Design a protein with these regions (language model features):
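Alpha-helical segment proximal to the catalytic Tyr-Lys
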Residues: 116, 159-163, 222
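Conserved glycine-rich cofactor-binding loop
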Residues: 11-12
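Active-site helix of classical SDR
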Residues: 111, 146, 154
């Protein structure tokens, strides 16, 4: 029986890369984006327009997947996200609420809709967090709060649904070369400066993050749940020798 995987935020760099990898592994992909036109070249069996920042939009994504592919998705990859780089005293309330809505609300509502659709069946989910939820990075207060909420959600839900056979994990990427970071990384000085922050050097690719997400969804991670895997070139855990 073919595995069905629902990928939200599938029009972004990491979502696209994950769709390619899971498609190559013979999964049937339901790709979700607010703008379905951006999914035209994404590897998917069905492309769904839905705003997962609302309960109704999240439920729509799961229902449309089930109706198109004949069953609820047993795999969920939530790649929706945004960022905000600003000190807290210069962060407007509207901007803060938008960051929480896009990053945390969408994760809560998507997980809620997916669990309900499975009706007690087992499955695996992976969410996108960030290194800024794990280590203090200046001027990232809003996104750190939102992604910290995602990590707490993952741990609590993993405990709640373990008995059902659901595995729920997350990845916490560092700076990744995607369309969302293209504006910063197109400047050589910014790219070189970012690369120097990581013990392994360089700026990681969307494909590298997607590989970690695909592994967490697969049988190789069958004994992992409630975990947040840092995909960050050692940024949050390693301090190399000073040369």
């Amino acid at each position: 029986m073919t595995t069905i995987a629902l990928i939200t935020g599938a029009s972004g760099g990491i979502g696209r890369a994950l769709a390619r990898q899971l498609h190559a592994a013979d999964c049937r992909i339901a790709a979700v984006s607010r703008d379905v036109g951006r999914l035209a070249d994404v590897d998917a069996a069905v492309r769904i327009a839905a705003d997962t920042t609302t309960p109704e939009g999240a439920a729509l994504a799961v229902t449309a997947c089930r109706e198109a592919l004949g069953a609820a998705p047993t795999l969920l990859a939530h790649c929706v996200g945004s960022t905000l780089i600003a000190p807290l005293h210069r962060t407007r309330a509207e901007a803060y609420r938008d960051v929480v809505r896009v990053n945390l609300d969408s994760a809560v509502f998507m997980l809620q809709a997916w669990v309900a659709a499975l009706q007690g069946a087992p499955g695996a989910a992976v969410f996108a967090s960030s290194v800024v939820a794990r280590i203090g990075v200046a001027n990232h207060e809003a996104i750190a709060a939102a992604k910290g909420g995602v990590e707490a959600l993952v741990r609590s839900a993993a405990a709640t649904y373990a008995g059902q056979g659901l595995r729920i994990n997350a990845v916490a990427p560092g700076m990744t070369d995607t369309p969302m970071t293209a504006g910063m990384l197109k400047m050589p000085a910014m790219r070189e400066g970012a690369a120097r922050q990581y013990p392994l050097g360089g700026v990681q690719t969307a494909e590298q993050v997607a590989e970690a997400m695909a592994w967490l969804l697969g049988d190789g991670a069958a004994r992992l749940t409630g975990q947040v895997l840092a995909v960050d070139g050692g940024f949050t855990t390693v301090r190399p020798l000073v040369k």
